Amino acid sequence: EKKQENIAMIIGEINNNNIERLKEYGINSLFLCSIGTTNVYSPDSYRDTILKIIKQTNPEIILFSGTSLGKDLAPRIAANKEYSIATDCTSISVKSEELEVKRPIYAGKIIETVILKINNPIVISLKINSFDINKQSQNEPNITKVENEIKENHTNQVPILKEIIFPEKKTLDVSEASIIVSGGRGMKDPKNFNII
């Protein structure tokens, strides 16, 4: 197991109670990030803020919670930086220069083990309620305040569905048919379906 510095980020409205609680969990550095109007979630502004911190800190592993925001931001960061990503992880183990993660697939019927090389930063999103948080000796993290403004071209990037254009179909889709006629091998030939 590798012992590394733990860095945390809080984006949006800053709650002093949250800062005090983080002191009990071994956080070495804490970035408090405010982005313009904090009660509005802007994916691009949040992404740019996280990328700014990544550039400053050069992390090996970037963890996101399994919340809706975490699931939205994790792939944005990975795609922007071309980092490896593993989602919905229930187990993480660092061994030498490899990261081993486990995650459920096929609606939880199978547990997949993924081995990732730590030659580039890795983005991980955690499955909710899969990890215990152990309190450690309280320490005073190095706190840095970061201010980012929402860029003008980031404020109105909500997609709006205006029209659905369906392709022309020569045959009716089975799911749209009002009557379905089925026959087995006993029909012998497609032309015999008119008997049914």
Functional labels for PLM-detected ranges:
Residues 1-196:
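N-terminal glycine-rich FAD/FM-binding segment characteristic of electron-transfer flavoproteins
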